[in-house]
Amino acid sequence: MPKNILVIAALPEEADAFHPGQGVIAQTEPHPMRVIEQAGRHIKIVTCGLGKVNAALAVGRYADADTALVAMTGTCGRIAEIEGDTFWITRAIQHDYGALGGERISHYRAGDWPMGEARDPAFTAMSDPGSGLPHATIISGDVFLECPTAANSLAEKLNAQLVDMEIAAVAQAAEALDLPWCAIKAVTDSADGESAGDFSANLKRAARKAAEAMERVVELAAKW
């Protein structure tokens, strides 16, 4: 019965924040990977790099027949009013996938044929096992969003509160492999003109908040 867990993080700071200093370095290339033994299972923590392609490649490369769960920990931007700073992700949408007509994109579920009637574009995470976190929908795309006008438009159109560059691709890859997925993200910035500075200033603090919450979820998963 599969029992191991694959934890994906985009950045070294996000990966290092998960059980910091524990485990062994299994490899440094092409993706840094640390392995922790916990409750009779292996937890692989992989740094995938930025963007949807890197995220999906990491899932495809490191999820195997012994993988029970694909998880992502890390940071994000806030694009709509929502209380809290660390969130259990319930739905993930690729905001740059679809059909572009004029200056307007019609969003489709990533991988679907982008013509005709579109179904719900969101990938749905596994049920929250008891994280105690507020729930949110996140959108992912291969851009660092620092425009409040674009952020507000996407938030309204896709009924989303958060943005990052990877989770929806992790979700798509996990679903293709018939694996459950989950994600926890902590906010660094507000996807506006101050985002670059705010992200840098808040990265390590937010990464640790997300990682601490993911550590608790992984402990809960040990009881499955």
Regions flagged by a language model, labelled:
Residues 2-60:
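N-terminal short beta-loop-beta anion/metal-coordinating cradle
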Residues 179-181, 186-224:
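Regulatory input/activation interfaces that engage signals or partners
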Residues 43-48, 137-140, 184:
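Active-site-proximal beta-strand elements of phosphoester/diester hydrolases
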Residues 61-65, 79-82, 172-180:
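Alpha-helix C-terminal capping segments
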Residues 76-158:
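Mid-sequence, gly/pro-rich, charge-dense loop/helix-turn segments that line enzyme active sites
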Residues 143-196:
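A C-terminal functional module that forms or caps the active site or interfaces directly
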Residues 6, 68-71:
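Structural motif
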